[in-house]
Amino acid sequence: MNRFQTYAIAAVAAAALVLLTAVHLDSQGAYYDELHQAPAAFHYIGSHPVMFTWPHHGIPLLNMTYSAAIKSTIYGAYLRFVDPLFSITSWRLLGIAFVAAGLFCFFMIAGASLRFQSAVLFGLLLLSDISVLVTTRHDWGPTALALALRLVFIGLWLSLALDATTGKSQRWKFALVGLVVGLSILEKLSSIVLIAPLGILLLTTRTRDKKGWRWAIAGLMLGTLPLVIGNIATYGKGHGFISLSEATTDKGDLGTFAYIYDYLSIGQGQLPRALVFGDVPNAWFGWSEAAALTALLIIICAAAMRGRESSSSLRLAGAFVATYAALAIAFPLIPHPTFVHHWIVATPFQYAAIALALPALKDNKNARRLFVAIAVFLIVMRIPNLITVEQSFASGKASDRYDGAYNKLMRLAATRSKDALFISSDWGSATQIYCGSNGQDDFVYEPFWNADSAQTVRDITSQTHKRVLYVVTTGIGAQFAASSAATIDALTQSRTWQSSPVEPEFANTGPIQIRKFVRSVEGN
């Protein structure tokens, strides 16, 4: 593409992504996992977050043992320098901004190496991917920053493989691809599977610079350096390597056939839709998606094997198919159960393969006609579900986990941040309450994480000077039901606290149950 086409398609693609994902951003409620990276951000406005915050020398380094507080830090800068008040709109916009920026950078980096038709096809495939749209808007994985980094990675790969420039000027690109993979692993350890794409990249670009791999390894080491430091620190304290602390041999109960189907049909967004909206598209769409994508990838492989000596684009398309297949093999090897927010790491490698193959098949008219027909079918078939998803975004349709009542809970928490204490008796409400209070210290507790939740809540309430206590129950996690009941029983039987009717505004909170306790006269 020429410079004008590159700028134009980059801007249009980024704008389209925003338009498709930013409709009524507060219509769905805030989900617990969606906000798990937010508490650490309040460190930057003077709070002392404990939830999902693993500090190193006082600075939040990790949100989980396997994920870095990068998004937390960026949003923390927003709170400190732009607007000190948390909102679900600004939080969701940050994830959208990540992907929009990544998409823009992809076209700017790879634009000179792409045909216009390839760029358009790549954009259409990515922007019609329901999983991409839903997980970008509702970044519970998290997935948004990781997708942005992969877009940059693929852009650099295309530039390295197809750009005619050789020599030392390319070495910074090798260093940068290594850095991007390193940052991806730092952002979430499950992205370690990107070592496979990095290896394939180095193989496909080895003629560009024989020492390029050294620069890539250097970039990789630099990107993962904070993670290495964190693990050395925990090991030195006798706690072992923190990133391996949640490794398990449990791989879940998903069968091989079901996994392959879910992997190939991810573009229809069946699993994200079920989680966010509580609905699932007709199975026909999923099977058609899987069949169409498989057919396209087979055509690419067949063409690449026949034309590997003559077409660099076809060879590269074949490399992207190999990457997509390698990632499918890699995910089950992760020592932890995986789900759609892990599998989406394979996107958009498959789209890069399809986009590259389109102009490269020009010499094989029959194969090209079939390829174009299937690609058009794949995109058109997504349109009905794309329309449904956009309508769901706008209308506020939601599952119990994303019920709009969670946004109401956040607003109610904000009004009680000075005079009340909140207890989340089970999983699913604490991050929302904490963010609603704008990072109020010692404001919300989760006793269910402890073996004796009843004693934990007695200890918490005996140390507070607040006179009002709200107990929030979501019922989402059945495994916490007994702990939740024990917490409520401990307060009901307490001589210090007595049950009281909740205020009218707390009474209508959908699937969320809220109980109020006030300090008794005897407790005074």
Regions found by a protein language model. Give the residues of each.
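Transmembrane-helix motifs of polytopic, lipid-linked glycan transferases
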Residues: 10, 89, 93-114, 152, ...
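Hydrophobic/aromatic-rich transmembrane helices and adjacent perimembrane loops
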Residues: 38, 96, 136, 193, ...
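Membrane-proximal, lumen/periplasm-facing interface regions of secretory-pathway glyco-
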Residues: 340, 368-418, 426-444, 448-451, ...
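Membrane-interface helix-loop-helix junctions at transmembrane boundaries of multi-pass membrane enzymes
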Residues: 2-5, 111-118, 165-171, 205-216, ...
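Short acidic/glycine- and proline-prone juxtamembrane loop motifs at membrane-interface regions
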Residues: 31, 135-143
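Extracytosolic helix-loop segments that constitute the early lumenal/periplasmic catalytic or substrate-binding loops
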Residues: 19-20, 35-80, 236
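Transmembrane-lumen/periplasm boundary regions of multi-pass, lipid-linked membrane glycan transferases
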Residues: 40-43, 47, 183, 195-300, ...
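Loop-to-helix entry region of an early transmembrane alpha helix in multi-pass inner-membrane enzymes
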Residues: 69-73, 81-101, 139, 283-291, ...
